[in-house]
Amino acid sequence: MSGSLKSLDKKIAKRRQVYKPVLDNPFTNEAHMWPRVHDQPLIWQLLQSSIINKLIHIQSKENYPWELYTDFNEIVQYLSGAHGNSDPVCLFVCNKDPDVPLVLLQQIPLLCYMAPMTVKLVQLPKSAMDTFKSVSKYGMLLLRCDDRVDKKFVSQIQKNVDLLQFPWLNAIKYRPTSVKLLKTTVPIVSKKRQK
């Protein structure tokens, strides 16, 4: 009987307790809910001629004629309302290019939907990242649509890009996400096995 207890103790010692999230990422269902762009070549041409080509020739961010953000953390901070602006914004994203990490892209549609301001989310055509690299290493550009931005440019974006729609979130828009942890065990992998 004592021999069987020792073997049981050895089996237990080879496993350790861990906590795994029940939902790996609460935004995975919404990650594929990008609004449709009706005339993508036109939108891409407008963005290149009106914004990107001008930004390429400007040396520093302080000289930009518009308020815009290209860093992922700055964009998230802006969309969370930290800047206190209620002006509508356009967020252009290279979501079809492999250079942009999926972890960043999964959160974008829901962040835009939950933002306190009106956000027009615009997905750009494949290989747009080649042009975008000189402006943004993350393939994202958030442009505040205030008086400094051409009204015709903004109206074309508004007309050709659908609204974000998450009908199942309308009633619970400001309720926090509840992610639970599951208590389980995993085997302890020795360093000899890893090599």
From Swiss-Prot:
Pfam families: RNase_P_pop3. GO terms for biological process: intronic box C/D snoRNA processing; maturation of 5.8S rRNA; nuclear-transcribed mRNA catabolic process, RNase MRP-dependent; rRNA processing; tRNA 5'-leader removal; tRNA processing. The keyword Acetylation does not apply. GO terms for cellular component: cytosol; nucleolar ribonuclease P complex; nucleus; ribonuclease MRP complex. Keywords: Nucleus, rRNA processing, tRNA processing. The keyword rRNA processing applies. It is found in: Nucleus. Present with 1360 molecules/cell in log phase SD medium. Component of nuclear RNase P and RNase MRP complexes. RNase P consists of an RNA moiety and at least 9 protein subunits including POP1, POP3, POP4, POP5, POP6, POP7, POP8, RPP1 and RPR2. RNase MRP complex consists of an RNA moiety and at least 10 protein subunits including POP1, POP3, POP4, POP5, POP6, POP7, POP8, RMP1, RPP1 and SNM1, many of which are shared with the RNase P complex. Required for processing of 5.8S rRNA (short form) at site A3 and for 5'- and 3'-processing of pre-tRNA. Belongs to the POP3 family. This is Ribonucleases P/MRP protein subunit POP3. The gene is POP3.
